[in-house]
Every structure is written in C-alpha cells, then in structure tokens.
Amino acid sequence: MLLCRQRRLYSYIVTLYLIFFNKIIINKPAALKTKVPLLLACNHPNSFLDAVLLDILFERPVWSLARGDVFKKPFYSKLLLKLKMLPVYRTREGVENLEHNYKTFDACKQIFKQGGCVLIFSEGLCVNEWHLRSLKKGTARLVTSTWIEQVAGNSKSSALQVLPVGINYSSFSKIGKNVFINFGDLISSHEMNLNESDGKMHLQFNQKLQTALQPLVFEIEKHDKEKLKKQFALPPNAILKFLFFIPSLLGYFLNAPLYLFVKWYVQ
C-alpha cells in the first residue's frame, strides 16, 4: 500500500514537471549518471522546485535537505520524508532546534556509506534571483566532517565527492519555463588540508565551492530584460531549420529564371 502511494505521488510530480518546464538544458548530462557517494552543492533560486527537478533528472534517488520548520506538522513531515527530504534547521528557526542537525548529518553520512546521493542548498535560503549569494557553513561542516570520519575509519567505501550545481530558470512565475542546469567539476578530499582547524577548513572549502559555483549561476539584474532574454536564448531547433529550408529552396528555384533574366537585361 505504501509503495503504491509513493508511486502515485511520484507520478503526480512527473506530471507537474511536464507542465512547469518547456526545455531543460544540461551542460554535462553525464553528471546525472555519477555513481560515487555524492553531495550536490547547489544554489537555491526556486524553493521546492529545485529539489524535485534534480530528483527527477538523476538516475538514482536524491535525498535533499529542506528547511526544518516545514517538518513541524506530522502530515508534512511524513510527506516530505516520502519525497526523500530531511530537515535542517537554521538559527532563525530556533537555536533549540540546531542540535537536530546532527541527526540529519548522521543520516546523510549513512547515505554516503551506501553510495547514495544528497542535495544541499549551500546558500542556506531561497531567493528568486539570478545571482549567487554568499555560502553558509552547513555544506562545509557536512563535507569536512564526513571526509575526516572516512579517513580516520579507513573506510572501504568510495570517498564522498562534491558536485557543484547551478540551476537557472528563465522565469520564477511563468509556466512553461526553460531551465539551464550547469554542473561543475567534482571536488574531492584530496584538495583539502584536513589537519587544519574546523574554522579554517570551513573557510577554505567555502572559498573553493563559491569559486566553482560562480560560473555556473547566471548573473542578471532583476530588471535587465535584454540580458535575461539573451542569456536564456535557445539555439534554433534543427528540425525547424530544415522545414524552413525547404520552402526557401523551392522559392529560389521558382524565382531563379526571373532573377537571371532581369540580371541579363540590366547588364
């Protein structure tokens, strides 16, 4: 019964996906097939839709971290857990709730041990804009603590890798929007000095991740409609180009005799 409900819920989500999006352009489609333990470190421009989009596109299940306050009501908590979402709390949601983040991080580490994939929104909040905001420390804490535990425990499983992800929507309100998803290069523990203090490690990691995300996220002023249109312009469809070519070619052959006669007469 539970499996049937989950399948129905997933089918509803896929239907919404088909309604909401016109085209999805991915710079590195092969990234969707990555098999190693993976943390998707992503910007957060469009709330719940960001997580649903990546979960549908990846070949394997993607667990995502969501605002802890939406888990307060039992109904929503059960629904979100079925959608593979885990709560993460910020100071604004109550300092007393921050300790629950340790349970969520432990759950993430178990997912990594099983070779799974987790999505985290590294900006820490959702804002409808074409801009990469400063990164919070949550991603750095989860990543560095996981790497340290893997090294200390001589883990036989593959080491966690971090994949920077930039999601860019042509619109935040219109239905039938285009989406550009840009994947960066994988970040591994070998690029970090894990013997530093926590503060230095978190700062070092965030600088590396911010640099990796910057070219993946479109930078457009809210009222710059010209740049927005140019940035999200799609290449011409090859089939349409071919269909337009046929009448153009036909017109050329029909008008060629008249053109050649006029050219000869003028000369």
Residue ranges and their predicted role:
Residues 1-4, 50, 223-240:
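Compositionally biased, charge-rich terminal segments
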Residues 2-13, 18-187, 193-194, 249, ...:
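Soluble catalytic domains of membrane acyltransferases
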Residues 19, 23, 216-223, 253, ...:
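Short secondary-structure junctions and interdomain/linker hinges
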Residues 93-100, 201, 234, 238:
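Juxtamembrane loop-helix boundary motifs flanking transmembrane segments in multi-pass membrane proteins
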Residues 138, 204, 241, 245:
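Short, well-structured alpha-helical interface segments that form or flank functional binding sites
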Residues 195-234:
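Long, charge-rich alpha-helical interaction segments
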Residues 240-266:
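Core alpha-helical transmembrane segments of integral membrane proteins
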